[in-house]
Every structure is written in C-alpha cells, then in structure tokens.
C-alpha cells in the first residue's frame, strides 16, 4: 500500500500489514522494481474531519512504468500544481481527474467544471478519464451533470477522453469507441 504521510495508520487499523505500507511526502517516490515507480505529488484538499483535521497529507500520484506515465489526481481542487506537474512530467499518457461532487463553496477542494479543461490542458496528458461522479450524491448538481461537462472537455481540449462503462477494460494503446454525449449521459 502506497499512501501519503500519516495515512498508513488507517490501513493498519483496517488490517493491512504495516511492513507493506509505504508513506510518501510530496515529491518522494517508491521504486517498485522492473522499471516501475510511484511518486507522490501535490494536490489541493484537506484531510480528516473534526479534531483529526489536517493531521495527514493529501496527495496525487504518478505511476511510471517502462512504457507509460499515469497521473492519478485523486480528490482535490484546481491549483497551480497541475501546471507544475505537467512541466515536470511531460508526455503523461493518462490523467485520471476528479469531475463531480463539486459546489462553488468547495471550489478549493473539488475541481469545478470550468477548471477541469484547464487542469487537463496544463497536465498535457494524451488521454483523460474522469472519476468522482455518478456514484453518490454529495453536491447539489444532477447526478449526470459531470458527464455533460466531459463532453465540453472533449470538445475543448486536444486530449482524448476515455468514458468507460462500469467494469469495462480500456487498453491504453487502442482508441475507445465514442460514447453518448451530454444529451444522453447514460449511454442508453
């Protein structure tokens, strides 16, 4: 298990072997062998609730393999870190970005729709896949609104948007068939 600083305690509580938990600070990396590394990178959020607020680090991750760079943005708001990561790690093959459960009151911890395309452009990833949507209702927007913003993202950037169905395997080296757009986000 690779996680940001202080989060390992939660994995221990859930029964994970402490010897198999690696905590990383921003810009630290863990070598996994055979040319694979995981690097913890900045994100913009907070951690914990109540009395345990902000006692652990939040982060994003870059998985580098011999053939690919995959950026996992995690749960977080827009910030200058996207441009910095894009500059430091050019040629990202896939960026997994948050798109959903947003609200103007949470704009510093959840990426807003108008910021999604900007973050994608700054990262410079060839392909984008969004997460953090269509599963539960935390925000006031419709459950399918984030899927509509994806259509705008695809039209507004040079990156290819992956829109897999739940459970679908999408090989990175092959194009994905077009899916329904904003007028029919369910694909039905």
Could you say what each language-model-derived stretch is?
Residues 24-90, 166-188:
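Core dinuclear metal-dependent hydrolase active-site scaffold
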Residues 20-22, 37, 160-162:
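Conserved beta-strand segments of alpha/beta enzyme cores
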Residues 3-12, 79-166:
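Cap/insert and terminal regions of metallo-dependent hydrolase folds
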Residues 2-3, 73:
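Short beta-strand scaffold positions
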Residues 6-7, 18, 33, 38:
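Structured beta-strand-rich core segments of catalytic domains in phosphoester-bond hydrolases
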Residues 17-18, 37, 143-145, 177-179:
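Short low-complexity, flexible loop/linker segments enriched in glycine and/or proline
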Residues 11-23:
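Helix-loop-beta element that forms the nucleotide-linked donor phosphate-binding surface
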Residues 15-17, 32, 155-157:
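Short, structurally constrained coil/turn elements
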């Amino acid at each position: 298990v690779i996680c940001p600083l202080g989060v390992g305690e939660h994995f221990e509580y859930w029964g994970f072997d402490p010897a198999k938990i690696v905590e990383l600070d921003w810009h630290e990396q863990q070598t996994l062998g055979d040319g694979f590394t995981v690097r913890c990178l900045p994100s913009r959020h907070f951690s914990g609730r109540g009395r345990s607020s902000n006692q652990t680090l939040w982060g994003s991750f870059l998985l580098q393999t011999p053939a690919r760079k995959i950026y996992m943005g995690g749960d977080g708001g827009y910030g200058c870190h996207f441009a910095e990561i894009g500059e430091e790690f050019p040629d990202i093959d896939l960026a997994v970005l948050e798109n959903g459960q947003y609200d103007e009151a949470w704009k510093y911890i959840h990426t807003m729709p108008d910021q999604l395309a900007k973050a994608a452009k700054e990262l410079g990833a060839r392909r984008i896949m969004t997460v953090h949507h269509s599963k539960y209702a935390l925000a006031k927007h419709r459950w399918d609104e984030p899927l509509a913003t994806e259509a705008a993202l695809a039209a507004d950037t040079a990156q290819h948007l992956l829109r897999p169905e739940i459970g679908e395997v999408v090989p990175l080296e092959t194009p994905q068939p077009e899916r329904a757009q904003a007028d029919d986000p369910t694909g039905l």
